């Protein structure tokens, strides 16, 4: 069994190859050549010490959540990703979303590899969005607006610029200007972007009311909007940004890639935005429990599950044909991603093969 560290994953990965691998796995999904059971969510609790006699004995405190996500890509790979959400890890200098993938041999079932998968998770999510950009965005986009300044935001920018060299402006909005400044330096240093070719800008502070008008102005300019945050509330007002008085969507179509939320209480997009868009998802079951869909379907009753027009696998296979929405004349598409294990396993298998080719990783015989 091969142990592959996070640092080795970063050395081995090629963003273009990851996009190609993920596009192929969505094509296989369209041919029903994958198996992807629903994820299992396990709340991780610990017993709190009793502070006084009035408190209940054995009171439980939620530490975090673990998600178990198995999948099979027929004739290629099988495995499981275990990913957690542990907010207090930030205080310990650890990833708040730790992830590990176990790959098994498709002939014997034995474990082939254990792979640090935090970077893989970011890369496969960004690859899904990049694929949606390839098929659903305007042909020659010039401007991206990105909410967030994390690894997820970085990988989205890198992959989208890789596929769409026509892009000239990138606006990045985050609560921390310092984090955005660091991200911009990193983007320029790691990708050798010519300062004259791509203009990177910090745009206001997400969540700051005084900056709303500035954010809205640049959102109206954007051809692609990416939301990659942990926000509990919508990041912008759809009534203001998606107004036909402000923008001719037939002449300037809009693609929104929403990847940050996965729980019913969290959402980055409001119900107006969702209900007035052509909605594509990566995985129906996972997205149905994200706030973007759960709230307008189950709490507000303004749309139904049928508002989902297709999956990304339908897009890449040609089963889904892009259209203007039936509710308005706008040409607005939302690609909602909550993550699918077929991407995790396919991307991990790609890393495993490259590690073998490059003699990277630590071999351990656990069956000895």
Curated annotation (Swiss-Prot):
Superkingdom, taxonomy of origin:
Eukaryota
Q: Please state the Enzyme Commission number of this protein.
A: 4.3.1.-
Q: Which UniProt keywords apply?
A: Lyase
Q: Which GO terms describe its molecular function?
A: lyase activity
Return the Pfam families for the record: OCD_Mu_crystall
Q: Which InterPro entries does this UniProt record tie to the protein?
A: NAD(P)-bd_dom_sf (IPR036291), ODC_Mu_crystall (IPR003462), ODC_N (IPR023401)
Q: Which GO terms describe its cellular component?
A: cytoplasm
Report the sequence similarity comment from the record: Belongs to the ornithine cyclodeaminase/mu-crystallin family.
Can you name this protein? Uncharacterized cyclodeaminase
Task: Write down the species.
Answer: Dictyostelium discoideum
Organism lineage reads as: Eukaryota, Amoebozoa, Evosea, Eumycetozoa, Dictyostelia
